Every structure is written in C-alpha cells, then in structure tokens.
Amino acid sequence: MDYQEGGIYMKKSLTAVLAFGASFGVLAACGSETNSGSEETVITVGTEATYPPFTYKDKGELTGYDIDVLNEAAERAGYTLEFEAMDFKGLVPALDAERIDLIANQMSITPERQEKYSFSDPYAISGAQVIVGSDNEDIQGIDDLEGKVVGSTQGSVYAQMAEEAGAEVKFYKGANQVLQDLQVGRLDAALNDRLFILTELEKTGYDVKAVGDVFNQSQAGFMARQDSDVLEGLNEALAEMKEDGTMEEIGEKYFGEDISQ
C-alpha cells in the first residue's frame, strides 16, 4: 500500500485546515486549553491528497478512505486534526522533523519502518499488482520485471519490490505521471495497490491494465514517531469502529467491501 506508496488520486470540510496546517505544525500533538478549561490534543497530519480513493481532494475538500477513517477515529478519541498536504516523498522527512505528528497515506506496516516508527493498528489490508500498457503481452506479473523500466514514487514499498524483482526504477512525483508515461511507452510497467487499481483505473481512462495475481499482502496503519502518545486513543477508536460496523461502512463507500480485516 502506500504509493506515493506510497499514487494518483468523502464527513468534514478541511479546506481551511489544510491552508493553516504548516503554521500549526509546532503545536501538533501537544495540549492546548479550550474555552471550557479542558486540554485539547491537536494532531498535525501529513497526507498526499493526490492518491484516490485513499486521500484526495474533491471540489477542494480533503476526502478519501484514509481521511474518513482518521476523522472518525480522532473524533471518538477526542483529538483535533490539522492536515498538511505534501508530496509523498516529503511525508517521512516531515515526521522526522516534527513538522507533522502522523502520516495518513496508506503507509504499509513493514519491519524496516517499525524499527524507527510506531504504527496504529491496521485499518486497511491489501496487496500489490503489476500494471502495464493495454497492448503489452510480454509482462504477465512480478516475475517478468527483471531488466524492465518500472515507474514508482521515491520511498514507496512498490519501488523496493520492483528493485528486488530486478527492474530499473524510474521515480515520479505521483501516480498520474507514472500512468501517463506508462500508456505512451516510456515505462514498461508500474506497481500499485490492488485497491487503487480496482477503483481508479476505470475512472481515469488511462490506456493501461492490471496483470498477474495480487501478491505481497500488506497492512496499512497511521504512522507516527516512536514517542507518540496519540496511537493508544486511535487504536481504541479503531477497535470500536470495527466492532460497530463503521469500518465496514466506510470500506463499502469506497470499495464495495470491508478492507479493514
């Protein structure tokens, strides 16, 4: 998961919040006093906002599966969210620099990341799949990528998968650019999340197709620094949402199925 992890491109209006996200970065995840005298936990969240149906803008408003899940979980936990949109490659550096406190962008939970970061409990389960031009019959799956040029975004788990398959990886800013170059033959293939492929390829109209089996099942979680104290509240809310059917409802909205388990 993650296309931008990781890609290309509905609850609360966050347009104004995005505009002020950067200025509130230094206040993130710290307590501020409300008018009632209670302490408010404000979390600055980094997201790509160009990876539908997970995180994207619809008529200027931030929306998507990840955003809906986090909004609901934060409301139940009593947290206030401030969103900051940025390129995928800037998400982890922003977390390291404490500009943001949390990443909501289909971040795959991997052993390598867990060595340095903390994750919420998984809220999405998926896998990877290969994408090629619609007239490409040579590539039928991950095993055919050796020596091929594969498009991805920097820092993506899909870039790592392509490299491990022996491909030459060409990096792009986002999935739009990857698919554009793929359909005109500048790339041999791309890798992405099977849920992204399931929901977006038909909508976008790119002259590409998915090939081969889904592989490398992965789980996505909200990613934070190891010293984060907000994940416990989010995990309690996520468990409630799975139990009362809210997660299933959000999954049905975007994918026609529950992708949380």
Ranges and model annotations:
Residues A49, I125-V132, L198, E202-A239, ...:
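Periplasmic-binding protein-like
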Residues M107-E115, M161, D188-N216:
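A ligand-binding cleft/hinge motif common to bilobed small-molecule-binding domains
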Residues T80-D144, V208-K209:
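Acidic, polar ligand-binding/catalytic clefts
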Residues E39-Q106:
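Extracytoplasmic small-molecule ligand-binding "clamshell" domains
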Residues G25-A29:
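C-terminal motif of bacterial Sec signal peptides marking the signal peptidase cleavage site
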Residues L62-E72, Q129-L179, R194-L198:
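Bilobed "Venus flytrap"/periplasmic-binding protein-like clamshell domains
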Residues F83-L95, E137, G155, K170-V184, ...:
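Short helix-initiation/N-cap motifs at beta->coil->alpha
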